[in-house]
Regions:
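NAD(P)-binding Rossmann-fold cofactor-contacting core
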Residues: 143-167
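Conserved S-adenosyl-L-methionine
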Residues: 142-146, 238-241
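Rossmann-like adenosine-cofactor binding region
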Residues: 169-242
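Glycine-rich adenosine-cofactor-binding loop
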Residues: 9, 102-105, 112, 117, ...
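Phosphate/diphosphate ligand-binding glycine-rich loop within oxidoreductases
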Residues: 2-117
Length: 278
C-alpha cells in the first residue's frame, strides 16, 4: 500500500510540489505518492488530524495555512517555526506527535549559497513583509546577515524588523518604506523580492529597474512564474547576478523530504522536474 504525502492550501491547483516530490519518490524506488489537497484555514486542524489518522507520511502547507498551523493545539512547532510564526512542513511521529517546521528560510539560504553568496556579513535588502519575507529574514539574520526590510507599508517593515531583533539573532535588522530603495541598493550585496510584483499575470511589474541596480549585486526573486521575471531581466541588464525562485522552491521541498523520510532526495532531478512543469 502506497504511503501518502501531500500539500494543503487554497488555492492549490497550481502547485508544482506533487510533480517534484513524485519524481523524487519514483527515482528512489519508494512506494509513495504525493497529492495536492484544497483545505480552508477553518478546516486545517481536522485535515491534519485526519491525515495523521490515515497514516500519511507528511505534509506541506502553503498559502493561506502557514500562520494558522502555528496556532493549532495538535502541532508542536520547532523553535525556528515558532519564531517565524509559520509552519510549512508537518512531520508525523511514531508516537502520535505532530511536529511543525518551516523550511522556507533554509530554502532561500541554500539558493543564495548555490549562487556563491557569503551570507555572514552581507548587506541584504528584503522587499516585502509577509510570511515568506519573515521566514527568509529570520534565517538570514540567524546566519549573520545585515538585513533591511523594505515594504510599501513602512510600519509593517519596522514591526517585522523588531520581531527579528527581539529574537536575539546575530544579524542587524532594520525596517523602512520602499521610497529610497534605489539609494539603499547602491550599498547592498543582495536584493530579495518576496512580493508578488512580477508574478503571473502581472508580469510587467517590478520592484526595481536596471538603473537602480549594479554589477556587484545579487538579485534573488522568489517568484518563479514566469521563470524569468521582469526584475531578473532588469538585473541581467544591469550586470547583476541573478537567482531564480525555482531554487528556493526546490531546496525548501528537499529539506521537507529529509524531515519526512531521513533520506537524501535527488535535488537535481527535483529541479529539472519543476523547470519542465513551468
Amino acid at each position: 500500500m502506497k504511503r501518502v504525502f501531500g500539500v494543503f492550501g487554497d488555492p492549490i491547483a497550481h502547485s508544482l510540489s506533487p510533480a517534484m516530490h513524485n519524481a523524487a519518490f519514483s527515482a528512489l524506488g519508494m512506494d509513495c505518492i504525493y497529492h495536492a489537497f484544497r483545505v480552508k484555514p477553518e478546516k486545517l486542524e481536522k485535515a491534519i488530524l485526519g491525515a495523521e489518522a490515515m497514516g500519511f507520511g507528511g505534509l506541506n502547507l502553503t498559502v493561506p495555512l502557514k500562520e494558522t498551523a502555528l496556532k493549532l493545539d495538535c502541532i508542536k512547532p520547532d523553535p525556528l517555526a515558532e519564531k517565524i510564526g509559520a509552519v510549512n512542513t508537518v512531520v508525523f511521529g511514531k508516537n502520535g506527535e505532530i511536529k511543525g517546521y518551516n523550511t522556507d528560510g533554509l530554502g532561500a539560504k541554500q539558493a543564495l549559497q548555490n549562487a556563491a553568496v557569503e551570507i555572514k556579513g552581507s548587506k541584504i535588502v528584503v522587499a516585502g513583509a509577509g510570511g515568506a519575507a519573515r521566514a527568509i529574514a529570520f534565517q538570514l539574520a540567524a546566519n549573520g546577515a545585515e538585513i533591511t526590510i523594505v515594504n510599501r507599508t513602512e510600519v509593517r517593515a519596522i514591526e517585522l524588523a523588531k520581531d527579528i531583533s527581539a529574537a536575539a539573532l546575530f544579524g542587524n535588522v532594520t525596517g523602512r518604506g520602499l521610497s529610497g530603495l534605489k539609494d539603499l541598493l547602491q550599498n547592498t550585496d543582495v536584493l530579495i523580492n518576496t512580493t508578488t510584483l512580477g508574478m503571473h499575470p502581472n508580469i510587467d511589474t517590478s520592484i526595481a529597474i536596471a538603473e537602480d541596480l549594479h554589477p556587484g549585486l545579487t538579485v534573488f526573486d522568489i517568484v518563479y512564474n514566469p521563470l524569468e521575471t521582469r526584475l531578473l531581466r532588469e538585473a541581467k541588464a544591469s550586470g547583476a547576478k541573478t537567482v531564480s525562485g525555482v531554487l528556493m522552491l526546490v531546496y525548501q521541498g528537499a529539506e521537507a523530504f529529509r524531515l519526512w523520510t531521513g533520506i537524501e532526495p535527488p535535488v537535481e532531478l527535483m529541479k529539472k522536474t519543476v523547470l519542465e512543469a513551468l
